[in-house]
Amino acid sequence: MRFDAIVVGSGMSGGWVAKELCERGLKVLMLERGPNIEHGPDYSHELAGRLRKRDDQVPLEERQLHYPYYEGVAYALFNSNKKFWASDHDYPYETVPGKPYRWIRGYHLGGRSLTWARQSYRWAPDDFESNLKDGHGVDWPIRYEDLEPWYDHVEAFAGVSGDYDGLPQLPDGDFLPPFPFNDVEQAAKAQIEAAFPTRHLIMGRTANLSRITKAQMDVGRQRCEQYVRCHHGCPLGSYFSSLAATLPAARATGNLTVITDAIVESVTYDAAAGRATGVRAVDRLTKQGVTYEARLVFLNASAINTAALLLNSRSDAFPRGLANGSDQVGRNLMDHVSCGPVIGTYPGFEDTPYQADRPTGLYMPRYANVTETGKPYLRGFGFQGGAARRRRPDAEPDASGAPKRAWVFSLTPFGEVLPNPDNRVTLTTSRVDSWGVPLPVIDAAHGPNEHAMMREAARDAAAMLSAAGCTDITPWEEAGAKLTPPGDRIHEMGTARMGRDPATSVFNGWGQAHEVANLFASDGAVMASSASMNPSLTYMALSARTANHAADLLEQGAL
């Protein structure tokens, strides 16, 4: 069967592309390299509820072999849900000596949309103009106004809870009611904002349903019950994922075909026609090759895999990889950067109960080089954090005989990483995986801007906790020197950027390849910069916009 469109990848962006195309009447084939996951029955949510976390840890030897990136996702990777985390042993990649990279993946239907932290922020107008203003990277070919209606579109369907905060550096959206602050957070917010009036501590905006709408009920989703076992999959569909939301909507049209265990290794290309004709894939289980054909091809395999697919799709017409006349495929790999968390003990509130059942923390939007200028670095960062109780074994026991728990407040910065063409993905010429596909080689490191930014972020965090009255605050010099390695924040992007000029970019502002008109992408690969906010909501908006534009072109006979 020949399809109207092939979508490679079933995660955050691929699910949106499939939904939009199917609802426009296109026959869509979705290819997922990993196994099928059934929404609900294949989740570990109920099992995790019966286990103590300490009894659900991946054994040390297994962790060292399969999950060496564990440190960055220790909050979410457990023995009961390890199938949602790709094994570095089974799916290897290479790095450059002295430049570690943590590539954290989810190879199964739904991808990392099952395990993401659900933080959902619109980028600001300035984020689409920063490259132009300071000369790093290339200018975005779109502006916030181009994406604004698509932010509206995806928020209404996905469901994002949050406050209307009225901050230009973090645009408001179509929100469900926010989750509440606890008493300590309310007190700390007042103290911090009084001491630093240019900074704002807000409730995190999260893709958890604090209230149900018809759009969500129509695909079988339910209101969030705040079990806080989201990383095990939610059988209620209370947080947004491909399995809970976009794929049910796509399937409801009757236009979607899903094939799992299909490892796409390259895009096929007809040089005479100047068009992509489909993809070549390898069956994960049988290792047999198969070719699928379609009028349109969408790459939504995640930034590194999308770049690897293009690089491996070489031909006489494109000896450096498909659509790579600019030599930009694989370049400008970005993530976000954090330093060590800054934590302080918050006094008082000893009799205030703590319920660890909120599916989001607090957020402080960027202020550096926005409301506070003259910084010794470009761009900026936001903070994620909140207040919780921590066990104090040295304290007097409470009435039940259990050790008292002190309130602690933590802040962790997430900083923007500048585009750098030397941070890149290539393919090894000497090693292939179990399916005969060349391994990606990742060469990336943080630069002086990221180091300077994190040093100040740690100092700022300590100053804010001090203003809130905290004691025993993490030494900021210590925290600011501990940068997360690239990849650790799980926001990889930028390997096939969109831009205005085919000489310096791979895709145009619609996610359409400059050199191959029926080839599209809308995952992290197309990002021209990284901003300071989590990128998933922007991936969703770009995907909906790209898919509808492609459908328009097909209807007009332009493809």
What are these regions (language model features)?
Residues 529-547:
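A conserved FAD-binding loop/helix module that cradles the flavin
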Residues 5-30:
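N-terminal Rossmann-like FAD-binding beta1-loop-alpha1 element of flavoenzymes
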Residues 54-87, 91-102, 107-108, 116-122, ...:
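Conserved redox-cofactor binding core of oxidoreductases
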Residues 7, 11-12, 183, 304, ...:
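Residue-level detector of alpha-helix initiation sites
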Residues 39-42, 161-173, 471-482, 556-559:
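Short, glycine/acidic-rich hinge or "gate" loops at secondary-structure transitions
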Residues 82-112, 116-117, 122, 135, ...:
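FAD cofactor-binding and catalytic pocket of flavoenzymes
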Residues 202-210, 227-230, 259, 265-268, ...:
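A glycine-rich dinucleotide-binding beta-alpha-beta segment and adjacent secondary-structure elements
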Residues 23, 27, 34-54, 236, ...:
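Glycine-rich loop(s) and the adjacent beta-strand/alpha-helix scaffold that form part
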